[in-house]
């Protein structure tokens, strides 16, 4: 038995494995592109370490794809055979992984909360809880957990910066922008390469309409992101969003091609259809197209990838994005095939399947109807679930693309009541008035 760097027991006879565990967890906290290699080094140091197998399973789940779900299942099954003589905390991690694999992130979240009640320094449970609740639209839960855990931490404990970054983002998604910015900037002061803290402040600057500050924020910090994973693409997407609001469409296209959708970059080549990259690219192309910008053939590679993901519903928020790509390229047959795959998936038990059935399917149907020019139908499909969209996950800034689609359909269908409904909705969710936002000004 050894302890991790925060003093929590890890069931392994290998000091090398214990150090490798810390190195892998640090890679997860800091969004390192070599996280997979770190986990493999941990497994090589002690293949019988239950937490090593669980960490591999968590890594598979965090990619939100059917392909890596298979990897997670295998790791979970292996871990199950190794957990008999481990600690209750480690066994709870094994249970959380197992229920997450079965599509119930809500149960997994509850288990991580139980772990944190007894072990508030379990940074792995904390970050998994934070990100999962983000992807299921529960900022209130994110914030409550930050507040309950952070009092047990001190700035001398390894991983404290991750607590600050999560504090910043939980406050931002809860609309508490001043508190979010203070925490995020403090995290960056301590570690300028902290990607999650940089991301939280980028959200604050976007939501408060400080676009030129946002551009400077990203440009100042980006040289410290070498070795980081695809989250840096998302920061560059935020940079493009600032430029879009300022009307600099040529700069947006430049950032698309050389920053957040650079097809020849090693990160993109490694996983060409990673959910966050797909969301970045498709949502930006939709916005640009709506503003009359010629995006050339950029839709095609995304639609090609969409066709290979039929039935893959691990990340519900990605599904309407795939549908946008299929609709934009006129692939109605493939789009209907994807909808059928969603319907099949929605028959399964678990929280994820319910969200797909109750929210992702009607919104994806609306996206297709919009793409087919059936604007009144698109509004009718989407209107009943506008208030449920947060369950898909994604930030306020990310969900904006779906709100813009609804508004565009309402305007083109001449549905003035629905136009007003949407404008009132975004007015209550965003501190910048619609009249001062490029996607809404013409309808405000």
Q: Which residues does each PLM region occupy?
A:
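Residue at a conserved register position within TPR or TPR-like alpha-solenoid repeats
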Residues: 27, 60, 99, 133, ...
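Flexible helix-coil transition and linker loops at the boundaries of alpha-helical arrays
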Residues: 8-10, 78-90, 117-119, 150-160, ...
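Generic helix N-cap/helix-start motif at coil->alpha-helix transitions
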Residues: 15-20, 49-50, 86-92, 119-126, ...
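Helix-coil-helix junctions within alpha-helical repeat/solenoid scaffolds
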Residues: 243-444
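Alpha-helical repeat scaffolds
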Residues: 38-41, 70-83, 106-116, 140-153, ...
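Internal metal/ion-chelating core segments
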Residues: 145-246
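Inter-helical turn/loop elements of alpha-helical hairpins
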Residues: 15-18, 23-40, 44-48, 53-106, ...
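Well-ordered mid-protein domain cores that form the structural environment of catalytic cofactors
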Residues: 81-180
């Amino acid at each position: 038995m050894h302890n991790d760097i925060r003093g929590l027991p890890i069931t392994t006879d290998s000091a090398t494995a214990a150090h490798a565990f810390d190195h892998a967890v640090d890679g997860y906290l800091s969004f390192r592109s070599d996280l997979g290699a770190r986990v493999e080094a941990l497994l090589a140091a002690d293949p019988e370490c239950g937490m090593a197998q669980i960490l591999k399973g968590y890594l598979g789940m965090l990619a939100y794809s059917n392909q890596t779900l298979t990897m997670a299942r295998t790791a979970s099954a292996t871990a199950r055979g190794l957990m008999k003589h481990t600690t209750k905390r480690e066994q709870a991690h094994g249970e959380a992984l197992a229920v997450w694999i079965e599509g119930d992130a809500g149960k997994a979240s509850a288990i991580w909360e139980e772990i944190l009640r007894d072990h508030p320094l379990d940074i792995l449970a904390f970050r998994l809880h934070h990100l999962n609740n983000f992807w299921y639209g529960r900022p209130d839960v994110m914030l409550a957990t930050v507040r309950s855990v952070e009092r047990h931490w001190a700035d001398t404990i390894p991983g404290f910066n991750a607590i600050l970054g999560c504090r910043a983002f939980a406050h931002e998604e809860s609309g508490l922008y001043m508190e979010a910015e203070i925490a995020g900037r403090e995290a960056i002061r301590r570690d300028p390469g902290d990607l999650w803290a940089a991301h939280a402040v980028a959200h604050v600057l976007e939501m408060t309409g400080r676009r030129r500050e946002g551009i400077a924020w990203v440009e100042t910090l980006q040289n410290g992101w070498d070795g980081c994973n695809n989250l840096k693409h998302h920061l560059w997407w935020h940079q493009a969003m600032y430029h879009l609001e300022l009307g600099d469409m040529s700069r947006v296209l430049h950032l698309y091609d050389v920053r957040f959708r650079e097809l020849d970059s090693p990160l993109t080549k490694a996983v060409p259809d990673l959910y966050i990259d797909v969301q970045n690219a498709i949502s930006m192309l939709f916005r640009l197209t709506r503003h009359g910008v010629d995006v050339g053939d950029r839709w095609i590679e995304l639609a090609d990838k969409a066709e290979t993901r039929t039935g893959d519903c691990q990340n519900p928020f990605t599904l309407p994005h795939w549908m946008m790509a299929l609709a934009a390229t006129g692939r109605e047959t493939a789009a209907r095939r994807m909808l059928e795959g969603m319907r099949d998936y929605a028959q399964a038990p678990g929280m994820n399947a319910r969200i797909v059935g109750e929210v992702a399917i009607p919104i994806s149907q609306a996206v297709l109807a919009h793409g087919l020019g059936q604007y009144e139908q698109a509004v009718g499909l989407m209107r009943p679930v506008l208030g449920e969209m947060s369950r898909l996950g994604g930030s306020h800034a990310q969900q904006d693309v779906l709100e813009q689609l609804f508004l565009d359909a309402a305007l083109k269908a001449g549905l003035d009541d629905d136009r007003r409904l949407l404008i009132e909705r975004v007015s209550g969710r965003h501190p910048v008035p619609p009249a001062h936002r490029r996607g809404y000004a013409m309808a405000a």
